[in-house]
Amino acid sequence: MFTTKKSMLLFFFLGTISLSLCEQERGADEDDGVEMTEEEVKRGIMDTVKNVAKNLAGQLLDKLKCKITAC
């Protein structure tokens, strides 16, 4: 009877530790998720700005080319 209680106590203890570690990892993953979305937003904004600048530069070069070649 004593060995059964001892093994049950050990089983409960190990299960509690395992559950605690899983919760800590889940919390860390959730924190990283927020940071990733902020980084993705920053990347999205920078990509948009880069594309707008690229299009404006292309249009300005086309107008300049037209003025030079008198189209």
Curated annotation (Swiss-Prot):
Subcellular location field: Secreted
Residues of the signal peptide: 1-22
Cellular component terms (Gene Ontology): extracellular region
Tissue: Expressed by the skin glands.
Keyword Secreted appears in the UniProt entry: yes
Keyword Signal: yes
Protein name as catalogued: Ranatuerin-2PLa
